Regions:
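Cap/lid and interdomain-hinge subdomains that line or gate substrate/regulatory clefts
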Residues: 1-102
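Short acidic, glycine/serine/threonine-rich loops at helix termini
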Residues: 10-18, 103-108, 132-136, 167-170
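Conserved active-site and cofactor/substrate-binding residues in soluble primary-metabolism enzymes
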Residues: 41-45, 74, 97-104, 122, ...
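A generic secondary-structure signal
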Residues: 53, 81-82, 108-111, 171
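A C-terminal functional module that forms or caps the active site or interfaces directly
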Residues: 73-79, 106, 114, 133, ...
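Active-site pocket-lining segments that scaffold enzyme catalytic pockets across diverse folds
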Residues: 90-122
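Acidic, glycine-rich loop-and-beta core segments that form the ion-binding/anion-interacting portion
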Residues: 111-176
Length: 176
């Protein structure tokens, strides 16, 4: 589980997931996202979140935690070993507050995969950007999104029932 997403103001520190709201970091369980009608939750600590969402099937003390200290201390062998030893659908929590943290984690993840380990991943866009080697690009312009020579349409998927998503959708619908 790696919900770090710099562009969306999402950070995980000491296993607690935070959302940047203006100049404050708010524990995710205290934000409007936690009250989403489709997938509400109360826990900001990701181990507790796992326990809550699995209705106790997976316990927070059984999760594997990858700390910022391990990542920033470049303890690659130690992290890789943790990943290799994880079994029985064990939940792995990745702390990250910067893309460098995710990049270091991905080195260890790739090492574990090369050692024969398989993973099912739940993450924000940052992990897929790093593992895929996708470069940062500016936001797409209208010219990049719409080709006036074609009558093909487009698809916009809105995936959350929160005020912020509704405001973003409204802004999109009001634009040319």
């Amino acid at each position: 589980i790696c919900p770090f997403f710099l562009e969306g103001g999402r950070y995980t520190l000491n296993n607690v997931h935070y959302v940047r709201e203006e100049k404050m970091l708010v524990p995710a369980g205290q934000t409007e996202f936690a009250r989403d009608k489709s997938f509400s939750y109360t826990s900001s600590h990701l181990g507790e979140y796992v326990e809550e969402k699995s209705q106790g099937l997976y316990k927070k003390e059984d999760c594997v935690y990858i700390s910022l200290e391990e990542l920033r201390g470049l303890r690659l062998d130690e992290i890789t070993e943790k990943l290799i030893k994880a079994e029985n659908f064990c939940k792995i929590i990745v702390n990250a507050v910067d893309y460098t943290d995710v990049e270091i984690f991905c080195i260890c993840w790739i090492r574990a995969v090369k050692a024969g380990k398989n993973f099912l991943v739940r993450s924000a866009a940052a992990l897929t950007r790093v593992i895929g080697g996708v470069c940062e690009i500016p936001l797409l312009t209208r010219e990049k999104l719409v080709d006036p020579k074609t009558k093909n349409g487009g698809l916009v998927i809105v995936g959350s029932h929160v005020k912020k998503s509704s405001a973003q959708l409204e802004c999109l619908m009001d634009s040319d």
